[in-house]
Amino acid sequence: RAYLNNPETEIAAIAVRRPETAQAYQKSLGFSCAVYTDVAKMLHEADLDIVSICTPPSMHPEHAVAAAQAGCHLVLEKPVALNVEGFRQIRAAVDAAKVKTVISFVLRWNPLFETIQALLGAEAIGRLFYGEVDYNHGIGPWYGQYRWNRLKAEGGSSLLSAGLHALDALRWFVQKEAVEVFAYSTNSMNLELYPGGYEYDPTMVTVLKFKDGVIGKVASNIECVQPYTFPITLQGTSGTIRNNQLYSKKLMPGQTGFATIPTILPDSGDVTHHPFQHEIDHFVQCIQLNVESHANLVDAAKTHEICYAAELSAAEGRPVRLPIL
């Protein structure tokens, strides 16, 4: 839908496993295009400038490398790859082809995120020294993706499956390089609610050390029994941001409690709630202006290496120094 709404783009082709899926999309959205069941054939035959890769994560390296080698710019769903090797394969292909990329850390375009960035830029809470962002979203059989997301070979880890949205948010707010990671993980084995169970620990807490002494925490829980939440806390030398609430001794010295900012929060796990239109509009403009996206593959490597390091830390019970990617 985002491509249809952008006046500079049109959908030229879709590659799917089942043609009827593409036909249903075309009918519901009112457009027509070529339909393929073979990605390589589509890349060879169709006249494409941008390829959006929304396949299961284990397929990303194969599809992203092929699209980059075909000279296409990439919109790549997260996780980019489930391991360091897969990420490096994609990065090498992108570097060689000199194509542009945007990774779908789509919450960077959420209005609350934009508001928080403006507040941090204005030093509303002074110098940031602590931040935490959590991801709480029970992903069970009521979501179609559960059948593959629960598998180690496809979901990867709690962070790679979904929690990296929170991890990327923390990085986006802190704006400093992470230097060390320590993580713990667990699995409730709630087989009544999550039949078959997760093959990896769906609950993980990750503690991070950034340059210049900033520390942070990310909890990722995709087996929780509660409504979706994405809590944010950022503490600085002059105040605190707590979701859409601000306490700022600098801006409001007479303040006696948190002030609430009316805005759109990241309070739904439903992808229709996410600002994909802003992401696609941003990427099209990046291509037209020949500039890199702030959410490109280079930046995404810094979020993904924390995920890989957290998984290693939880498995071996030790801190992991960065970089590893």
Language-model-detected regions and their locations in the chain:
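C-terminal helix-rich "cap/oligomerization" subdomain common to oxidoreductases
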Residues: 4, 9, 50-53, 211, ...
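Beta-loop-alpha module in the N-terminal Rossmann-like domain of NAD(P)-dependent dehydrogenases
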Residues: 31-93
